[in-house]
């Protein structure tokens, strides 16, 4: 039985993620935790996202109710709209969400709180119109949120100097900050304004949530708690990979991409323990042919087994000589995989990652050493966290043209797979894996914050 917390009434929460896989997953996992505490949970996603998911998902979030609203791009979703998407989503989504709330209320359904993606701050305005408490959910690291907040408040000036400081975190070099802060000339773009707009009305939110855990960013979290009612509720992975307290919770259950699952698992089963380098850069990264060539050569030169996720549309960039390596069984190329199952497999010894925060948390939670190869957004800061602060990986630097060269990448892979520093990194990875599990266990820091939120919800 999944753990159940006895409460006097069953409150109802709407969860509204931004319609990207990396944002939807944390919301779903948080929803499952809330349900285990006796809270009724409804996920509100876009019509396009829901339709896309039904095509690929083999599992369902049976315990979470699903509702859909329009983002104004019901056919093509956010990828079809470009920079106009954010404004379209705000205008159309606000009305569609209001209509949904009216519909639910007319059916006798109460809504006690709306927890929304920080990237859709306009949801809070809708919630306030209906007298409903709101909570902003940040899917990025606390330190990244702090950097954006300090810029928003004018406490950090742009363009940046050579170094940047925020409370509770070691000094960052300019190149270690989120990319949008480095390229300040792009600061007026809609996506940039959205990042700073996360804080426009946040003081009106009753709660602020973050997908992190206390030991991971202890001092930054303590500072953040001085300004907001912060609930630290991560890592938001399926329970099977952490505390195993939720029955049959093995998958996010809301997949936008079709995974080559059995092919991956069968291939990994034939490989020795910690012998495979897993290479994946998330759903949004698109490498040019030159970078794909450099990654290929690095993997071949490293003489390791490798599993590389590269989307069908990108396969044409793969060099012809790679097919010979694939035929030997030393490498496997797939369009998508169930990353958690791959990282949890004993044959995987290293993760070459773009350092999106979901992938960052997954690597930490499953104890897999990383080669950090950040691409954009917050990933440069996450890479610093993994390498310099946690000691669970090593950063590979790009050249002046933004290309990571084969020699640098191969050197980092060998460092983790073969050298003494790799042994130290692996020990650190095990330590942080254990700390992540403790956080979500009963009485752990994240579990306590969820219990506290439920208590506050009931008293509303």
Curated annotation (Swiss-Prot):
It is an enzyme of class 2 (transferase). Disulfide bonds: none annotated. UDP-alpha-D-glucose binds at residues 139, 339, 354, 358-359, 362, 378-379. It catalyses: steviolmonoside + UDP-alpha-D-glucose = rubusoside + UDP; steviolbioside + UDP-alpha-D-glucose = stevioside + UDP; steviol + UDP-alpha-D-glucose = steviolmonoside + UDP + H(+); rebaudioside B + UDP-alpha-D-glucose = rebaudioside A + UDP. It holds the Pfam family UDPGT. The active site is at 23 (proton acceptor), 117 (charge relay). GO terms for molecular function: quercetin 3-O-glucosyltransferase activity; quercetin 7-O-glucosyltransferase activity; rebaudioside B glucosyltransferase activity; steviol 13-O glucosyltransferase activity; steviolbioside glucosyltransferase activity (stevioside forming); steviolmonoside glucosyltransferase activity; UDP-glucosyltransferase activity. Its EC number is 2.4.1.-. Induction: Induced by blue light and far-red light. An anthocyanidin binds at residue 23. Keywords: Glycosyltransferase, Transferase. Transmembrane segments: none annotated. Belongs to the UDP-glycosyltransferase family. Leaves of the 'sweet herb' Stevia rebaudiana contain a mix of steviol glycosides, compounds that are unique in the plant world because of their intense sweetness and high concentration in leaf tissue. Stevia leaves have been used as natural sweeteners in South America for centuries. Involved in the biosynthesis of steviol glycosides in leaves. Converts steviol to the mono-glycoside steviolmonoside. Converts the mono-glycoside steviolmonoside to the bi-glycoside rubusoside. Converts the bi-glycoside steviolbioside to the tri-glycoside stevioside. Converts the tri-glycoside rebaudioside B to the tetra-glycoside rebaudioside A. This is UDP-glycosyltransferase 74G1. The lineage of its organism: Eukaryota, Viridiplantae, Streptophyta, Embryophyta, Tracheophyta.
């Amino acid at each position: 039985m999944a753990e159940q917390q006895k409460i006097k009434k069953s409150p109802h929460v709407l969860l509204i993620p931004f319609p990207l896989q990396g944002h939807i997953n944390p919301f779903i996992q948080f929803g499952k935790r809330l349900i285990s505490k006796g809270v009724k949970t409804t996920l509100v996603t876009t019509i396009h996202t829901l339709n896309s998911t039904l095509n690929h998902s083999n599992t369902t979030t049976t315990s979470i109710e699903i509702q859909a609203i329009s983002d104004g791009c019901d056919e093509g979703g956010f990828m079809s709209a470009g920079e106009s998407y954010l404004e379209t989503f705000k205008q159309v989504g606000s009305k569609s969400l209001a209509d949904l709330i009216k519909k639910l209320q007319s059916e006798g359904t109460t809504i006690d709180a709306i927890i929304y993606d920080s990237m859709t701050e306009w949801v809070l305005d809708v919630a306030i119109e209906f007298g409903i408490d709101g909570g902003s959910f940040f899917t990025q690291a606390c330190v990244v949120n702090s950097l954006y907040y300090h810029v928003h408040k004018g406490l950090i000036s742009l363009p940046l100097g050579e170094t940047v400081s925020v409370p509770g975190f070691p000094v960052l070099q300019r190149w270690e900050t989120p990319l949008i802060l480095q390229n300040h000339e792009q600061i007026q773009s809609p996506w940039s304004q959205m990042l700073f707009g996360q804080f426009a009305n946040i003081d009106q939110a009753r709660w602020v949530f973050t997908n992190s855990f206390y030991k991971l960013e202890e001092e930054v979290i303590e500072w953040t708690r001085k300004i907001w009612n912060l609930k630290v509720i991560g890592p938001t992975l399926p329970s099977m990979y952490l505390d195993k307290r939720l029955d049959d919770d093995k998958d996010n259950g809301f997949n936008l991409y079709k995974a080559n699952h059995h092919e991956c698992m069968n291939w990994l089963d034939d490989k020795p323990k910690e012998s495979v380098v897993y290479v994946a850069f998330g759903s949004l990264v698109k490498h040019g042919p030159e970078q794909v060539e450099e990654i290929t050569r690095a993997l071949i030169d490293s003489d390791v087994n490798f599993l590389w996720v590269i989307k069908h549309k990108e396969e044409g960039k793969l060099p012809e000589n790679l097919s010979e390596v694939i035929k030997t069984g030393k490498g496997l190329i797939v369009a998508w995989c169930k990353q958690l199952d791959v990282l949890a497999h004993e044959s995987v010894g290293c993760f070459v990652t773009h350092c999106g925060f979901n992938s960052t948390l997954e690597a930490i939670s499953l104890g897999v050493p990383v080669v950090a190869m950040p691409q954009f957004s917050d990933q440069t800061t996450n890479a610093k966290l993994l390498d310099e602060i946690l000691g669970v990986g090593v950063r590979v630097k790009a050249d002046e043209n933004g290309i990571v060269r084969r020699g640098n990448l191969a050197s980092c892979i060998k460092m983790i797979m073969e050298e003494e520093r790799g042994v130290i990194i692996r020990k650190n990875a095990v330590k942080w894996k254990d700390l992540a599990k403790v956080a979500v266990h009963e009485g752990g820091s994240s579990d306590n914050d969820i219990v506290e939120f439920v208590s506050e919800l009931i008293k509303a």
